[in-house]
Amino acid sequence: MSFASEIKKELTAIETEECCQLAELAALVRMNGAISISRQGYSLDVQTENAAIARRIYTLIKDNYSIAVELLVRKKMKLKKNNVYIVRLKEEVQLLLEELDLIINQYTIVRTISNKYLEKDCCKKSYLRGAFLAGGSMNNPETSSYHLEIFNYYEEHAESLQKLLNSYGLHARLLARKNGFIVYMKEAEKITEFLSIIGAHKALFKFEDVRIVRDMRNSVNRLVNCETANLNKTIGAAFRQIENIKLIERTVGLDQLPDKLQEIAKLRIQYEDVSLKELGELVTSGAISKSGVNHRLKKIDEFAEKIKRGESIT
């Protein structure tokens, strides 16, 4: 089961007050519903590939309206051939749509979120819950970048949904797609807040656990990479120093170096693997600091560079 499916399974088990049930149902019908108009009047199909969501829609309608409801199952013919669940209404459809504020004046479809679902905080959260059940998806936080989105067919509804999300400070963004619009979030903290708002608390804790592990792993990787880079830099410097000392020894001899540089050059050749700090402690004339060793080795490098360029070393 995908992470998004786990969230939706949890959401379909939440019990709410009547006002919140209608807010959730309004989002589900608006986003997943298809209205047909004939001489007999309206008919409504609310379609989903998730059995738990289909049962949720069926129950919300039966609990709040005295309307005959059918629950149909069809086999999807393309691709994975998943089941498609259809909640079908043939009676009192206009009454339902008008009470949910999805149509006005019999035939005018309302594309935005009704103000009656924005008056109470519980209803706003329930509308968002219904919107995620209808069109929400989320990347697996264990294997992908953080991303949660809600798909909408209509731009007006996507814009009002974005506005509702951002009333909670979620920094939701809107993007046009080929066949609709998505409202999405990529910040882990905002996704966590959204899961809390819609009541997906189990999913929230799982998401936070995954996030903590990922952050720790990333911190360790950055630390290892930093230490590896420093080690490579140290090894590279030591290799260069040794090569320069050997060049001086082959060409003009180490005795051409000042005494202090001779001493550190011989120690560098003798103890190739030790750190600058350890090298400084080996100086027989008296231990010197790491920066002191580094200064002398730089002087040796400069001496070697003069030889490479054919310059006078006197």
Curated annotation (Swiss-Prot):
Coiled-coil blocks: none
GO molecular function, one term: DNA binding
Keywords: Cell cycle, Cell division, DNA-binding
InterPro entries from the UniProt entry: Homing_endonucl (IPR027434), Sporu_reg_WhiA_N_dom (IPR018478), Sporulation_regulator_WhiA (IPR003802), Sporulation_regulator_WhiA_C (IPR023054), WhiA_LAGLIDADG_dom (IPR039518)
GO biological process: cell division; regulation of sporulation
Keyword Cell cycle: yes
Transmembrane parts of this sequence: none
Residue ranges for the DNA-binding region feature of this UniProt entry: 275-309
UniProt keyword Cell cycle present: yes
Job of this protein: Involved in cell division and chromosome segregation.
Sequence similarity: Belongs to the WhiA family.
Protein name: Probable cell division protein WhiA
Protein species of origin: Oceanobacillus iheyensis (strain DSM 14371 / CIP 107618 / JCM 11309 / KCTC 3954 / HTE831)
Gene name of the record: whiA
